[in-house]
Amino acid sequence: MCALVSRHVAIHSKDMHVSLLDQNSSIRSKLIQETVANKCIKNTDTVVPILDISAGEINPADISMCDTRFKSECGNPSTRKDCTYEDKQLDNRRIHLWGAVSKPGLGIITIPEVRDRNHDKTYIIVENRANATAVLCREGDSGAMVCADDDYGSGVEAISMLIGKDTTNPGKYATFRIDKGLQQLEKQTDSSFSLCQD
């Protein structure tokens, strides 16, 4: 089992470990070197820039302390559902995250597909909900999973992973599709990655 962390956090680890904290426990996770390295992924004829995601292995003795369930907007542990929506179908979708600081952060997807031509990457832009009393996220929340309650009340969809705030547009934040992040980890490590099922 692995923990997913922001690469921009992982690269600052002096001993290739990160601490994973919740209300009841602290676990140290050993970062997988290939997911932290500052390099592009080489495909057959192209070079693909990397997304802001790294992985750390959980010690088997610590796995029982991990709660792998996703939380609904109300904070209830819930069944994880795969997000099968195309990018454009995510427009105006109400989302939430449970980060290190924001518990919860509430937002909305406002731009479901932004292409960064300089780096050949695609992002999803999310922002604070109108009339919300709190912001979607705060410093320290990067790496949080951006989720949406399933339209039919049967679980939580994991959509993307939070990178951080858009410094040029207050109240807006950049994320990337989590399936793209998992694909990157697979290419970097020649291993299989998937989100935990509860």
Predicted regions and their residues:
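Serine endopeptidase catalytic core focused on the charge-relay Asp
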Residues: 1-139, 147-150, 163, 175-182, ...
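Active-site signature of cysteine proteases
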Residues: 151, 166-169
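C-terminal helix/juxtamembrane-tail motif
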Residues: 183-198
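Catalytic Cys-His active-site segments of thiol-dependent hydrolases/isopeptidases
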Residues: 156-164
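A short, polar/charged loop-to-alpha-helix boundary motif
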Residues: 168-176
